[in-house]
């Protein structure tokens, strides 16, 4: 495997790890939503989802380059 492909694979893995953390954080916010301000929670959930979507798009783009 070329050095570039290994680097790209590590980028994909890092994105996957980050997505996992963001999804866990999002789930935690969902559990806490009854204890905190609902409008603030909605804002944070929306931001998390946007970040997750962006990271997934970047991961998919990198995977396409690797193939």
What are these regions (language model features)?
Residues 1-12:
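Short, charge-rich amphipathic alpha-helices with coiled-coil/heptad character
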Residues 11-15, 58:
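Positively charged, hydrophobic/aromatic-enriched amphipathic segments
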Residues 17-33:
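Short amphipathic alpha-helical heptad-repeat segments
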Residues 22, 53-67:
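Amphipathic alpha-helical coiled-coil segments
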Residues 34-41, 67:
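Short, flexible helix-adjacent loops and helix caps
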Residues 42-56:
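Short, charged, amphipathic alpha-helical segments
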């Amino acid at each position: 495997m070329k050095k570039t492909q290994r680097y790209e694979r590590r980028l994909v893995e890092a994105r996957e790890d980050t997505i996992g953390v963001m999804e866990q954080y999002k789930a935690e916010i969902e559990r806490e939503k009854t204890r905190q301000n609902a409008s603030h929670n909605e804002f944070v959930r929306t931001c998390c989802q946007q970040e997750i979507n962006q990271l997934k798009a970047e991961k998919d783009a990198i995977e396409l380059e690797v193939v």
